[in-house]
Amino acid sequence: MSEFINVTVVREANVFFNGGVVSRTVIFPDGTKKTLGIMQPGEYTFNTGAPEIMEILTGELDLKLPGSDLWDRIGGGESFEVPANSSFTMKVLSLTDYCCSFLG
């Protein structure tokens, strides 16, 4: 879906890593949340509270998921899941547009 209808967008930005990652929170009528954001090239480690699905809309990154020593290349049109209460690392190779869905 390229468009969300009847949602609330939080005006203030979520800024991480000195502006290397910036997103906006979108709240749906049922209370679920997503963030829409941009990542600049760089390496970032995120911690999760809830499980997440990260959809990469455009761009390219190398990804290391919890419990893995391997890096996987992820590009536009691909997605990955991250369990709750874990961390994952991304080496962003080019400007990357993403949508993160918070589950549970």
Curated annotation (Swiss-Prot):
<dbReference type="Pfam" id="PF06865">
    <property type="entry name" value="Ppnp"/>
</dbReference>
<keyword id="KW-0328">Glycosyltransferase</keyword>
<comment type="similarity">
    <text>Belongs to the nucleoside phosphorylase PpnP family.</text>
</comment>
<protein>
    <recommendedName>
        <fullName>Pyrimidine/purine nucleoside phosphorylase</fullName>
        <ecNumber>2.4.2.1</ecNumber>
        <ecNumber>2.4.2.2</ecNumber>
    </recommendedName>
</protein>
<dbReference type="GO" id="GO:0047975">
    <property type="term" value="F:guanosine phosphorylase activity"/>
</dbReference>
<dbReference type="GO" id="GO:0009032">
    <property type="term" value="F:thymidine phosphorylase activity"/>
</dbReference>
<comment type="function">
    <text>Catalyzes the phosphorolysis of diverse nucleosides, yielding D-ribose 1-phosphate and the respective free bases. Can use uridine, adenosine, guanosine, cytidine, thymidine, inosine and xanthosine as substrates. Also catalyzes the reverse reactions.</text>
</comment>
<dbReference type="GO" id="GO:0004850">
    <property type="term" value="F:uridine phosphorylase activity"/>
</dbReference>
<keyword id="KW-0808">Transferase</keyword>
<dbReference type="GO" id="GO:0004731">
    <property type="term" value="F:purine-nucleoside phosphorylase activity"/>
</dbReference>
<dbReference type="InterPro" id="IPR014710">
    <property type="entry name" value="RmlC-like_jellyroll"/>
</dbReference>
<dbReference type="InterPro" id="IPR009664">
    <property type="entry name" value="Ppnp"/>
</dbReference>
<dbReference type="GO" id="GO:0005829">
    <property type="term" value="C:cytosol"/>
</dbReference>
<dbReference type="InterPro" id="IPR011051">
    <property type="entry name" value="RmlC_Cupin_sf"/>
</dbReference>
